[in-house]
Amino acid sequence: MNITEMIEAIKSGKKARRACWNGDKFLYYVPAASYIAMTDVAKSIMDESGKVKYKEYIAIHCKDGEVDFYTAPQCDLFANDWQTI
């Protein structure tokens, strides 16, 4: 599948990866929500309920088990080997 199809798949709750990725590396969708302000900076921008709103994003579960924001490189944008897992 291409990247557009992959985005639709993860927005429906699936995990996705490139066929060439190894280990436990995959992408998933994180919907917009909010979190409790913990730092002074976050507290300076929190809403009335003490939370900071964030926008939807794609997260990547890395081989080391940690999660990060995903920004697609050129090779991923034009790939046709995306698959759901």
Where are the language model's segments positioned?
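Extended non-catalytic interaction/regulatory regions in multidomain proteins
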Residues: 1-62
